[in-house]
């Protein structure tokens, strides 16, 4: 079996997280991969950083997001780090360095 290049593999895992979240929530979610995987300078030990845009955030959605990311990452032997947000939060906090960085280097999944 041919090995996937690191970024391709990370995107495939991010898409799996997105699909499982969308299915569980019953509506589409937006996922943006950022960090070393998105920049293409990830190492073998690098995690996969995902900004997950949800319709709303509460304790249940945070737990569900954490569970899905953990399961997908565990099965693949990768750590998947997630940051939940909403579209309104992204607009409101757009001037913060974190969101500027995600906008600059992020890859929509």
Where are these regions (language model features)?
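Short beta-strand->loop micro-motif that forms the acidic, two-metal-ion catalytic signature
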Residues: 48-52
